[in-house]
Amino acid sequence: MVVGILIGIIILGVVGFIQYTLIEKASKNRVESLEKEASLALEEAKREAESTKKEAILEAKEEVHKLRSDLDKEIRDRRNEIQRFERRLIQREESLDKKGEMLEKREDSINKKSIEIQELEERVQSLYGEQRAELERISNLSSEDARTLLLDEVRREIKHESAMLIKELETKAKEEADKKSREIITNAIQRCAADHVSETTVHVVALPNDEMKGRIIGREGRNIRTLETLTGVDLIIDDTPEAVILSSFDPIRREVARIALEKLIVDGRIHPARIEEMVERAIKDVENDIKEEGEQATFETGVHGLHPEIIKLLGRLKYRTSYGQNVLKHSIEVSYLAGLMASELGLDVNLARRAGLLHDIGKGVDQEYEGPHAVIGGELAKKYHESPAVVNAIAAHHGDTEMQTLEAVLVQAADAISAARPGARRETLEAYIKRLEKLEEIATSYEGVEKSYAIQAGREIRIMVKPDQVDDAGAIEMARNIVKKIEEQLEYPGQIKINVIRETRAVDYAK
């Protein structure tokens, strides 16, 4: 057993030795192989390094050659540029030399001319002195006297020219102002369309039949007397079929009588007690209508915040007329026109409309107020807390007080436009013709008047005067005298323009 173990140990030792020997040999071979590979790699690296070195040297030589070539080219370019500068400097120097020579020649020429001019000046001064002395001897005037005369003549000419220029500018300004005002007024009129109802002093009430006339008269005329007493209106019952005429200069009374009579006709019961009842109802109806008309006028014109009493006065204007023109419709139209013109001029439109609407409220009061309606209207507006501008526009629209605002001027202009519009106001044909004849008669009554023409429906009269009998100052005086005479002797709506024309003609012939 021990022998077996020993044999095993020996075998293991032999095997181990053999393995060691083989491993050592293999390691040796591996080392030799690695040494060969390293040697080959070293030689290869040397060859590559040598090749890289040669390439770097070649590249460096090429770069040096290129830099040298570029440097040589730059040097040549700089040298050429320097040569060009040198040539230009030489040329400029030559040019400056030539200019210097020319300047020297010109200076010599100028010096010669200066000497000649100085000699001429001395000669002129000598001649001037001789001529001045000769002129003084001939005219017997000293130089100061002649200078004074010349200055006076120049002053007269300048004064005349300045006067002509001022006159021309004034004429042009007036023409432009007239053109602008016409344009503003025309635009306002074109944008304002208002209707007018011409009122009369009578009203016709239709009857269902002629038997109703007897019932209206009543026994012994007591019904008609009662109605006339309560309303203050005259009832005219004549041969007109199926109609009764109410006559009164007070439109409100006439309207009360009309409403009461129509109610009685519809009711059929006509006696004094019933008449009194119907008249009371008619009065209330008219008062309500007055209030509604005043409110409607403020609504149409856009005027708000009026005192209730002012609104009532406006409503009463429906029953007032001026030369046949309804005063309420006229006031509404004036409000429109004043507002439109104010908008064109950039003024206070609301103020102009308010003053235009209220300008005739003085016509809405009864007889207890005395004085011009414009002044009364201004006092009423002040009483009911209207602004000072509105009060002034109302009081001044007929010239009773001085105008303080531009809106007041517009109200006056709008009032004149509304009144002067064709068809707005009327008068009888006979009175119209007589008024025109009287106008021309007044004009021709003055000495020196050649012809006179009443035009523009009697709102202007043109008077042709004889220039050899009436001078410019006389024409102005004649116009003023005619104005005074017309105001004293005639009654007319609106205003009348007096145009005195003096014409002088100078005729000659060119041959």
From Swiss-Prot:
Domain annotation KH: ranges: 201-286
GO molecular function, a single term: RNA endonuclease activity
Highest taxon of source: Bacteria
EC code(s) of this entry: 3.1.-.-
Matching CDD domains: HDc, KH-I_RNaseY
Keywords: Cell membrane, Endonuclease, Hydrolase, Membrane, Nuclease, RNA-binding, Transmembrane, Transmembrane helix
InterPro entries in the cross-refs: HD/PDEase_dom, HD_domain, HDIG_dom, KH_dom, KH_dom_type_1, KH_dom_type_1_sf, Ribonuclease_Y, RNase_Y_N
Membrane topology reported for the UniProt record: Single-pass membrane protein
Membrane-crossing residue ranges in chain numbering: 3-23
Localization per Swiss-Prot or TrEMBL: Cell membrane
Function: Endoribonuclease that initiates mRNA decay.
Official protein name in the record: Ribonuclease Y
